[in-house]
Amino acid sequence: QTFFHPDKYKHYVKFWGFKGPLACWICIWGMIAMLTSAPFDDWWHNTYGLDVQIVSPPHIVLALGIFAIFLGSLQLVLAERNLAQESQKKIYDYLYLYAASLILLQFCIILTEYSFVNKQHSLEFYKLSTIFYGFVIIAFSEAARTKYAATIIASLYMIHRLLILWILPLFEAEPLLGPIYREITHYVAPEFPLLLIIPAIIIDIVRSRFTLSSKILKAIIFAIIFTLIFLLTQWYFSEFLLSEYARNWVFGSDRNKPFWVPVGDFNFEYWDYDWTPYGHKIPMSPVTVKNMALTLVYSIFSIYLALLFSGWLKRVKK
């Protein structure tokens, strides 16, 4: 763009004497963060031992870098879309939705340890899910020009996870790092994806039928829909995933246990405790009306921030 489209210079951002799209600067920052995370992670291993959880300081730096690259790519697509002719806008709309689904997927990966199906009757799971997934789905679907954008974003996330769930176990693999508590002969796939598509569909229907001009009112309505619908669907669906009916190639509940997890009845039961990396028990909070009411407040605040963020995305032209 810099060399072949000099007429677009007026849309570029100047930084340290260079000119380029703002999205490129965001991607460069993400690249620097990812490169920094590698020696940081190596030092972390040498100091504290091997990884025992996904959420660690070097992994957060890496995740922020990946997020910046996704966000930069998405922003570049948006900027091109906002400047494109009407006949060219459709392809940019679909590229935008795909990039948004990758961001949703990244959040799901980061929250893996809080989203095990055995934890899906705990307050912690629903609190984090409504805060982060609600933010991503609302923020990027609001900025989209496509009808049923939230549904498309959630669908692309589910398709990606389902393909991983079904394809990974086709390849042979064996663990080489102890402790090994179970026989593993193939790659272990992640758990069945969360049913984020259900609240996404309801939100899209409400958005298409009602015009809500107030951001506060919209945040309240979307938060109530997302929190209640997600709670109801995932609560009972998790019970199915723990049952013997989900132990097949479609749902993969009998093939998603890693080698370091001992074999036992607790593999298919809800957990009352979580564990620290040092082996200490942490009691998990129950889902009560009072706790979910507070979670709803968090969700309203998160979705309100998502609406503000989507407003900025709509104006991106650089």
Task: Outline where the language-model segments fall.
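Membrane-interface interhelical loops and short amphipathic "cap" helices
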Residues: 40-60, 109-130, 165-186, 242-256, ...
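Long, well-ordered mid-to-C-terminal structural blocks that present hydrophobic/aromatic surfaces
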Residues: 134-202
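C-terminal transmembrane helix-loop-helix hairpin of multi-pass membrane proteins
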Residues: 180-193, 212-235, 245-307, 311
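Membrane-interface helix-loop-helix junctions at boundaries between adjacent transmembrane segments
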Residues: 10-26, 39-98, 112-122
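Hydrophobic cores of alpha-helical transmembrane segments in multi-pass inner/ER membrane proteins
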Residues: 1-2, 60-77, 128-145, 191-207, ...
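Aromatic-anchored segments of alpha-helical transmembrane domains
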Residues: 33-39, 102-113, 156-169, 225-235
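Juxtamembrane membrane-water interface segments of multi-pass membrane proteins
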Residues: 2-22, 47, 72-94, 139-153, ...
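Metallocofactor- and cofactor-centric catalytic cores in central/energy metabolism, strongly enriched
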Residues: 1-4, 31-46
